[in-house]
Curated annotation (Swiss-Prot):
Main location class: mitochondrion
Organism domain of life: Eukaryota
PROSITE patterns: PPR (PS51375)
Disulfide linkage: none
Family affiliation: Belongs to the PPR family. P subfamily.
Gene3D superfamilies in alphabetical order: Tetratricopeptide repeat domain (1.25.40.10)
Signal peptide span: none
Species this protein is from: Arabidopsis thaliana
Transmembrane helix keyword on record: no
PPR repeat feature ranges: 194-228, 230-262, 263-293, 297-331, 332-366, 367-401, 402-436, 437-471, 472-506, 507-541
Origin organism lineage: Eukaryota, Viridiplantae, Streptophyta, Embryophyta, Tracheophyta
Coiled-coil annotated residue ranges, if any: none
Keyword line: Mitochondrion, Repeat, Transit peptide
Stated name of the protein: Pentatricopeptide repeat-containing protein At3g62540, mitochondrial
Amino acid sequence: MAAAPWLYLSRRRSSTQTSLRRFLICSSSFDADEFISSQSRVIGGRGEEEVRFSGALFSRMIHSSTYHPYRQIPLPHSSVQLLDASLGCRGFSSGSSNVSDGCDEEVESECDNDEETGVSCVESSTNPEEVERVCKVIDELFALDRNMEAVLDEMKLDLSHDLIVEVLERFRHARKPAFRFFCWAAERQGFAHASRTYNSMMSILAKTRQFETMVSVLEEMGTKGLLTMETFTIAMKAFAAAKERKKAVGIFELMKKYKFKIGVETINCLLDSLGRAKLGKEAQVLFDKLKERFTPNMMTYTVLLNGWCRVRNLIEAARIWNDMIDHGLKPDIVAHNVMLEGLLRSMKKSDAIKLFHVMKSKGPCPNVRSYTIMIRDFCKQSSMETAIEYFDDMVDSGLQPDAAVYTCLITGFGTQKKLDTVYELLKEMQEKGHPPDGKTYNALIKLMANQKMPEHGTRIYNKMIQNEIEPSIHTFNMIMKSYFVARNYEMGRAVWDEMIKKGICPDDNSYTVLIRGLISEGKSREACRYLEEMLDKGMKTPLIDYNKFAADFHRGGQPEIFEELAQRAKFSGKFAAAEIFARWAQMTRRRCKQRFMED
């Protein structure tokens, strides 16, 4: 029996070092010595060699490419059957066939580690049935605009902080019902919110950018003596993510007001939040203003480095790196990995390879994360042979590959439609004791969606449930979208129903996918109901084809629907959407008037 491609590639480990060295030499666009210089410095009383970067060289544009994408191989029929055998499970529809007892050792995966997936788990002793009962009341009565609070009063709940946190977690994408429940609980006799429940509500307000309410809640916590460092961190990250630099810095003043110490960890948190929001320049300005008031540590320089790398400013990144060394700090593996990612993000692939080579020869030795960064980039560029060489080199170095590395390879081979190789990788993951995680499952679901194979995505989902891996909101959104794209509207709605049944709160993307699918199906009235639900919950107005959506009601001569939507949008602060709906209402009224005159 012929060996699978993955096994064939894995057996070539004896020649890995030679091939890797050859690849490094052949791909050089200029000498590594010119790019990275070493000089002897005394660090911490020891004479050691430090890697320094020539910032001027980063300004050059390197046109040569180190990648040689291979021709895609058509998907063999046997590969589909192989995956089907391993993933054959019941779909969302109750009328589907029974679960198959195929190979349990096969699972699926993905390599998208920049994406937020997953639902945070809350450790608690609360009865899940009680949480479900409360959430059902909130969901149903809020949607009907009924007196939710009165019904909650009648339930005679034994309120606990665990219960409040779990209910808020379920409504973390729907700030209005979450906040109403939070306020109702605050008024119950014998119950008082704690720092934990306040911070849960703060997180929801921060995520939905309800900054005025968020600050009011923060100040209320201050008057009750319930503020924690987590509270300030939530607020700082929220303002930074919204690119509100001045307001983010203003949190320092609130910390002073409530007698909280502003130390290096707090400043690092703010600098990191600004950097992640691609405000590297603003983070640098803030650091320059504050650097005389505190002692920067390794993390301080690393978050500044990351901020510049995220905006692809390698000249400033090199300056921070060298400044770190000048202040007696030796860049650790985290800093090296940040620089590796920065070089790859800035399309300096050959330079990243050189830095990786220097790390191997002079330290710090690459860790699993270092190899994952390199392998992920090779996979994105379809350079799978090189990705395998790096994987083999990692194993030869004594490092144990984790699920993230396998996920990158699975995504790379899956994109090339080499599902037989994907199968072997999944099998090896199980054999090596690194079972697929949630991101791994999401990766293969994404591959199936991209290849317009939603049924396979459903099988993967069922395998995920079978292996007790909790699906994320992203999991459902991908499968639902793939069905709507395939015009299988019944299954698209079935995915939505499954998500609600699982107790997962739909986010903005979930509603957008569903509303677009319903409009495409010609069910604009049903889409209108979900749009109203979004507005009532205080969620963002979805990016949909409003003209197509409105045209159905316009033809039917129903201006009152637009007027109702305009009113709801305006009440929710969605003024742009309100204006669109109001304009369509006027157009529809004029059309109705013309018809009446003609009759």
